[in-house]
Amino acid sequence: MKAIRIAIDGPASSGKSTVAKIIAKNLGYTYLDTGAMYRSATYIALKNGYHKEDVNLILQELAKRPISFKKAADGSQLVFLGDQDVTMAIRQNDVTNNVSWVSALPEIREELVNQQRRIARTGAIIMDGRDIGTVVLPDAELKIFLIASVEERAQRRYQENIEKGIAADFDTLKAEIAARDYKDSHRQVSPLKAADDAIIFDTTGITISAVVQFIQEKAEKIIDMA
């Protein structure tokens, strides 16, 4: 049985991470949250007051405090910068609203993409992000591109924030998601777009379990054929 690589891309709050985690657990695969890596770099920039021209300082800080993932007692994923648990810190609104400019820096993308490729080398991995199928793993055996309406994605993010105890306003989130979509799809380095061979799936009004079933069936078919 071949261990394949699954790339799940899509805009903010399209359900990538939720779906990827479930499928990884079902298949016994490793899940890599690439968004958390860019959020960690953004957290470093904000905490130190760094700007675009300080990219080398961000990279130095990442080298001193490497990003790592650990499992909590309940099975959830924890994100660390060095020995600091930043799992909740990188989900705060200030990080969310600044991650686009940090992730658009070519030097940051190059460093994190190299890290992601090293992790994926052995297969049996699911990665979600914005350029997994186009840049990070262009030869992934299965590529999925999830989309959903801005309204639905704002509702998902609102619910997520409330559950995590993060202050949220629906209309503000809606405007922020629309702005993030524009930034992500118009940046010069690795813009958000579906790979030519990706399966595009609109998750608007679709349950998480239905999305999981759709992708997992595709994955199992490829695994069985290998």
Curated annotation (Swiss-Prot):
Pfam families: Cytidylate_kin (PF02224). This is Cytidylate kinase. GO terms for biological process: nucleobase-containing small molecule interconversion; pyrimidine nucleotide metabolic process. InterPro entries: Cytidylate_kin, Cytidylate_kinase_dom, P-loop_NTPase. ATP binds at G10, P11, A12, S13, S14, G15, K16, S17, T18. HAMAP family: Cytidyl_kinase_type1. Belongs to the cytidylate kinase family. Type 1 subfamily. It is found in: Cytoplasm. One of its GO terms (cellular component) is cytosol. It comes from Streptococcus equi subsp. equi (strain 4047). Keywords: ATP-binding, Cytoplasm, Kinase, Nucleotide-binding, Transferase.
